[in-house]
Amino acid sequence: MPKTLAEKILSRVAARDAKAGDLVIAPVSRVMVHDSVIDAVMAGLRDLGKEKVWDTTKVAVFVDHAAPAPTPVVADSHRVLREWVRAQGIATFYDAGEGVCHQIMVEEGYCEPGTVIVGSDSHSNSYGAVGAFGAGMGATDIAVALALGRTWLRVPESIKVTFTGRPRKGVTMKDAIMRVVREIGTDGARYACVEFHGAGSLPQGDRITLAGMTTEMGAKAGIVVATPEAPDWLFPDRGAAYANEVTVDLSTLEPQIAVPPRVDQVIDISEAIGQPVDVVFLGSCTNGRLVDMRQAATVLRGRRISPEVRLEVVPSSRRQFEDAMADGTLLALSTAGAVIGSSGCGPCLGRTGGVLAGQEICLSTANRNYRGRMGSADASIFIGSPYVAAVAALTGVIDDPRPYLEASEAEFDDLVERRRSERAGRGAASVRSGDRSRELMVAAARIGVAAEIDD
């Protein structure tokens, strides 16, 4: 019987012929744990009567979600975590400032293609960027995996996503995956494995963006087919059965915007032009890499951000941070007015550094925009690419980055001045009123996305 990638991987690791719907006991090649759930994980191990993890060489621990510690309570939790890591003898430990767990897991080679990796974070799907079956799990399941070195899984059905064509300048794979989320919806891949075809030759960072955002469709895993790291056997069989198939033509795609408060409320940027923003966040496991910062610097180098906007830049790992320092990218962003944060999750989940106030409007390159994600439940979060983020920081409004990337110096300055003037003409009361955000929610509803609009 022809197999999908998920069926192949789980059959191989479980040493049995497995198909979608079967239950398997799967050995794990690595377990990832981070600071947000470590207390519950340690409690789970105690409940299991286990003092030691099954293999200290196959456990990776990170302090990234609330780092550096924002409160004494969190600082105490981090202290306990460090003591536990030392007592266990776990060598693979990344403390505050080293970066986001998912970026480091892939970047440092901890993810082996064709293996099962479980993590205490929903975006552990990111490990599919190199052909691994990465899955996020709760604290109890992670404790069991740490104790036994294996986990149970139901083999998921698979959804095939195929990319064709080449994206135009100013269009990124963040736009591509947002379009996929729009097509599938936040529940359309529930407990499925999303297979990406036509993306294997992409840079590793783009593949992390694709695999990681499958979480936003409800997926159990997301795997890029035919990556450079993949062994010869790691390909889906011809004739494998898929629950759904989606094709995205990159050559006709324009930049995409996710409208709050749902990540699948995605519209073309042409429908969002002029939406004012107060804060721009460039970072996260989705888009905090050197290539993302370089894209932003392409727009911002030699210029200053709008006085109406705060720009927060958080590299996804120390390596990305140092590479961006070495080539002048971070200097360009800092000179433009950005606040540069230490490597980690930053304000993405609203637990440290740069949280949003009530009524503030943010353009984020992260992966989630539900109410309260980055701070106040009364704030609004739009999601876009690094190019879109940079233009928003510069002008104070959401705009299509493509004209800026093609413009002469004089044309560029004219575009910026025009957008800033338009925002100023609206007045502060208009910016805070949310009228434009409401219009965009209605626009999202028109394209068949269920918009949530509160009075």
Label each PLM-derived region with a short phrase:
Residues M1-D455:
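Fe-S-dependent hydro-lyases/dehydratases of central metabolism
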